From Swiss-Prot:
Disulfide bonds: none annotated. This is LYR motif-containing protein At3g19508. Belongs to the complex I LYR family. LYRM9 subfamily. It comes from the Eukaryota. CDD domains: Complex1_LYR_LYRM9 (cd20269). GO terms for cellular component: cytosol.
Length: 81
């Protein structure tokens, strides 16, 4: 559970790097996705797949707004520890 909260916090920190007009959309999108997967199977593979997806999607959004993906280094460390 702690890792899930750390990943969520990492995603929300990246949302703050986005342009001001797009932050509310991505903050809501991230929250909805974390809430939707609250009841997911707690096996390591299920969670690892979700962490991989969260990281990849975060990179995609950063690239979309021309933000250097090195900003997601901390999230990568959390997701793949």
């Amino acid at each position: 559970m702690k890792k899930v909260l750390r990943v969520y916090g990492g995603v929300m920190r990246l949302v703050r790097l986005l342009p001001a007009d797009s932050r509310p959309y991505y903050a809501k999108y991230a929250r909805e996705n974390f809430v939707n997967y609250r009841e997911v199977d707690q096996s390591e593979t299920s969670l690892d797949e979700l962490f991989q997806r969260a990281y990849n999607h975060s990179l995609w959004v950063l690239k979309k707004y021309s933000i250097d993906e090195s900003a997601a280094t901390k999230l990568k460390e959390i997701c793949f520890e």
